[in-house]
Design a protein with these regions (language model features):
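Ankyrin-repeat-protein effector appendages
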Residues: 1-13, 133, 166, 175-233
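Ankyrin-repeat boundary/"N-cap" motif
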Residues: 6-16, 39-50, 74-82, 107-115, ...
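Ankyrin repeat A-helix N-terminal signature
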Residues: 16-21, 50-57, 84-90, 117-123, ...
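Ankyrin repeat structural motif
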Residues: 22-30, 57-65, 90-99, 123-132, ...
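A generic tandem-repeat structural signature
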Residues: 69-117
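Eukaryotic tandem repeat interaction scaffolds
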Residues: 87, 103-153
Length: 233
């Protein structure tokens, strides 16, 4: 897709200069008032930085960041470039966004923390980088899952075990009432024992046992029933 399909002519000129590596021209146009932090008026409300990311031109992306493109600036859908590139097949992009001031706790358009994308793809470099840069492992998504609970929901138990070692709270319950103990117990009852995730699920369960969690855990239905009675669980 061409830039002029999304952005006004002055912005397109800046993007063209950036793609040529012409920092002088791009900077002059920006100093004259061209703003890189705008959204296309049509859904999904793309930004110039997002457009450059989609070209996969890392030199151009780096120059745009240097010239003031904000990795935290939200698209029309609510996400931003940090959440967009976390877990992608292009590992340099996340580091570039964070180095330019990107928020490691950015949310996607569906209100998922950026680290969830990295967990979903088991992109270890991105997971570790986000944690190194201050990602909150207990930030929750819409259904109330933190990083460890989300990882368990999608059977990424090696990642879950690592997250638990780095501060993820194993007590958090999703809005439906499920906690990590319930999810891992359910996973172990269904998972093929030859799965590479099976021994990691066992490690997660043992971690919970060592923390004093009793098995079998309460089911989500039992938890919701207690919640309905005003009881603390």
């Amino acid at each position: 897709m061409q830039a002029d399909e999304f952005f006004p002519a002055p912005v397109v000129k800046v993007l063209e200069a950036i793609q040529r590596g012409d920092e002088t021209t791009a900077r002059r146009l920006i100093e004259q008032g061209v703003d890189l932090n705008i959204r296309d008026t049509e859904p999904p409300g793309a930004t110039p930085l997002l457009w450059l990311i989609n070209t996969k031109d890392e030199k151009a992306i780096q120059l745009a960041l240097k010239l003031g493109a904000d990795p935290n600036f939200k698209f029309g859908t609510g996400g931003n470039c940090v959440a967009m590139v976390a877990g992608s097949q292009y590992p340099n992009l996340l580091r570039m966004m964070l180095d330019a001031g990107g928020d490691p706790n950015s949310l996607s358009g569906t209100k998922e923390p950026a680290i969830f994308n990295a967990i979903g793809e088991a992109r270890w470099a991105d997971i570790k980088l986000l944690v190194e840069r201050g990602a909150d492992l207990n930030l929750t998504d819409g259904p109330g899952r933190n990083s460890a609970l989300y990882g368990a929901f999608i059977n990424q138990y090696e990642v879950v075990y690592w997250l638990l070692q780095h501060g993820a709270d194993f007590r958090i319950r999703a809005a439906v009432g499920a906690d990590l103990a319930y999810i891992v117990e359910d996973s172990l009852s269904l998972m093929d024992k030859s799965s590479p995730q099976y021994p990691w699920a066992l490690k997660v369960k043992q971690f919970l046992v060592d923390k004093g969690i009793k098995f079998p855990p309460q089911t989500p239905a039992e938890v919701r029933e207690r919640w309905a009675k005003g009881e603390k669980v």
